[in-house]
Curated annotation (Swiss-Prot):
SUPFAM superfamilies according to UniProt: Periplasmic binding protein-like II (SSF53850)
Protein name listed in UniProt: Phosphate-binding protein PstS
Function field: Part of the ABC transporter complex PstSACB involved in phosphate import.
Lipidated positions per record (N-palmitoyl cysteine): C21
InterPro entries: PBP_domain (IPR024370), Phos-bd (IPR011862), Phosphate_ABC_transporter (IPR050811)
Native organism taxonomy: Bacteria, Bacillati, Bacillota, Bacilli, Bacillales
Lipid-attached positions, S-diacylglycerol cysteine: C21
Signal sequence range: 1-20
Record carries keyword Transport: yes
SUBUNIT field: The complex is composed of two ATP-binding proteins (PstB), two transmembrane proteins (PstC and PstA) and a solute-binding protein (PstS).
Organism whose genome encodes this protein: Staphylococcus epidermidis (strain ATCC 35984 / DSM 28319 / BCRC 17069 / CCUG 31568 / BM 3577 / RP62A)
Predominant location category: membrane
Pfam families membership: PBP_like_2
Coiled coil: none
Amino acid sequence: MKKWQLVGTTVLGASVLLGACGGNDGGSGDGKDLKGSAKGEGSSTVAPIVEKLNEKWAKDHKDAKISSGQAGTGAGFQKFIAGETDFSDASRPIKDEEKKKLEDKGIKYHEFKIAQDGVTIAVNKDNDFVKELTKSQLKDIYSGKAKTWKDVNSSWPDKKINAVSPNSSHGTYDFFEEEVMDKQDIKAEKNADTNAIVSSVTKNKEGIGYFGYNFYEQNKDKLKEVKIKDDNGKVTEPTKKTIQNGSYALSRPLFIYAKDKSLKDNKVMSEFMKFVLEDEGQAAEDAGYVASPKKTYKSQLDDLKDFLDKHQKSDKKDDKTSEDK
């Protein structure tokens, strides 16, 4: 799996080179005086955005380390639930069963939408017949019902399809399963590494795969994007405009989930999340994704500041009560 080398921290595929969970060891809480760490895990789709955020963050926060792995959205939530991380990167919304496990442990959290993405369907660049597909046709391909291109469209070649998919640890897999497969099993070659999926499609003339928009953008000289046709005959393709306004059929938000306790007790975590929202998606754009509307960041930042202000007032009240006793 690809390793993202960050300025001031390191993101690894399965683990993070920091202590057990983030902590704050002092400092005033601003800029160069801020000290401590915050730890995350999760989506490989979100990882490039975190990398860009860290490049900016580390310039003024050399003693405030942020680290996040890219083991996949599902694996990230497992560590989040187990209490091993302060935040979790996700390319899908948290599932009901994950919410229940957090609730059972008394773990409260904030959900932050940090960017927009469009799951992109791509075929080999030498494929000259697949230009658009319906969700139903994609379902036939990825369920194994359509084994050749001719099974998808009678005018296409009678050649075996080589369908490739992320594995079930990825939020992209979950998203595709829900949006395209109607939760029917995906029967395709599965890979934990998105770069390996891209490579498989580029090397196989009958290949087809799906991944985040930025992975397509980085490899569009080797791949051919497939447009999506809906039930009404409307055809959409992933562009920054269609992804941001949600008109692309496979648009989705990208998230960071942060524990309330970490936001309240770990100054590095709270300052980093304010930094993320104040960035207003520029890091996402730099990483090849699409920023959310500015009002989305402002609204979330206002909510976060209100939450932190209430916590600080509560702490001061508790301190005064202790002194009075």
